[in-house]
Amino acid sequence: GLHGEAYRGHIFWDELFIFPVLNLRLPTVTRALLRYRYRRLIEARRAAKLAGYAGAMFPWQSGSDGREESPDLHLNPRSGRWNPDPSHRAHHIGIAVAYNVWQFYQATGDLAYLIDYGTELLVEIARFWVSRASYDEERQRYCINGVIGPDEFHSGYPDRPYDGVDNNAYTNVMAVWVILRAIDALTLMPLPNRLDIREKLGLTDAELAQWDRVSRQMFVPFHDGVISQFEGYDKLAELDWERYLQRYGDIQRLDRILEAENDDV
């Protein structure tokens, strides 16, 4: 963006916070900007397939052609060390794309957009999340493991610090939300259009039945009756905030401070 070159002009999920304003004041602009994602749907499908999933996996950092532009390494200027950058595991970017599609429709009632572009995006993102979820026999619930949620500081566990966390609450709940909105979009379409897109995408009754199972049996972690941010969140040690504030003053990048101390968030 205009603030600097740190992100090299890439597109993240920040449009999630901008589109609600545009939807009500300049909806034609939102519609045009949403085409950016649709035009990169082929690349998102390719990325999902390479990762072993179905549907479309949008990149955390997107550029001109829709490939994943997130770096593999990240420099910590406090320690001088280059560490793995696992931000490509922030798969919730696809949730943001789906949310923007649905919010645009809700604000404008533009059914033509859903028919031409939006439903296809929703279906392919829903497919990704259904394939991303794995069934836990013991819990009798579906789990989504190895992701990074909106809290990018927590990117793993002590024994696998860069492999993502399991069952991030935001990700799991919103994955179900995407599945339900994809079904809603299909239902809203006139029957001929619905049959056309189902044929185009090969969307079968059996696949929709699996969507229903995943949406009804998604695991959400709780601790003492409170939703946990992710599985194991309740086991995190509390930071000595006063000591770190006194020592460093600005602790906005606490992840860098702790890494320089050979520690981790």
Regions found by a protein language model. Name each.
Residues 1-20, 24-265:
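Acidic, mature catalytic/reactive cores of soluble proteins
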